[in-house]
């Protein structure tokens, strides 16, 4: 790690501020500073986010069960085409990927999986917002809609209670 790198050490995420002979100072996201003995840093797993060459855009859409299979297919194709045409989205043989991945209690799950050419979080967040807004528009244009947690309760007359 180097001064300025954004890393994760034992669940603490922050920027490396100083590397000394005996300890390293990391400023966490809440602005607190943690001094860590270098002997401990040498023994634990450190994730250095500053070395990323791309950032992952992975989101799951919860679609209403009323969504038709035609709408699902059209939506998956539209999102894939949008991502394929976006200048900051990485394209290769298997990515970007848009697939139905399962069925929840109240929704069908569609996963969007793509890498974005961004190495800094503020840049990624701007691109992520742009992609998310476009995907919202594509969902609505397809005739599909987002699901929200819900339950359906069916009330019926009990056959035994009505026969007595």
Give, region by region, the residue ranges found by the protein language model:
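Structured, soluble regulatory/oligomerization domains located on the cytosolic or IMS-facing side
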Residues: 9-15, 19-164
């Amino acid at each position: 790690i180097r001064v300025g790198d954004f890393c994760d050490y034992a669940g603490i995420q922050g920027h490396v501020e100083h590397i000394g002979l005996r300890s390293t100072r990391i400023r966490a996201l809440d602005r607190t500073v943690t001094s860590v003995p270098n002997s401990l840093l040498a023994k634990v797993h450190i994730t250095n986010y500053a070395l990323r060459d791309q950032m992952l855009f992975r989101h799951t859409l919860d679609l209403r069960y009323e969504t038709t299979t035609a709408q699902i297919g059209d939506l998956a194709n539209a999102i894939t085409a949008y991502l394929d045409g976006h200048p900051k989205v990485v394209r290769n043989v298997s990515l970007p990927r848009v697939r139905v991945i399962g069925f929840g209690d109240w929704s069908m799950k569609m996963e969007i999986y793509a890498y974005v050419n961004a190495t800094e979080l503020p840049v990624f967040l701007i691109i992520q917002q742009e992609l998310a807004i476009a995907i919202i528009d594509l969902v609505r244009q397809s005739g599909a809609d987002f699901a929200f947690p819900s339950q359906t309760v069916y009330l019926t007359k009990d056959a035994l209670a009505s026969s007595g």
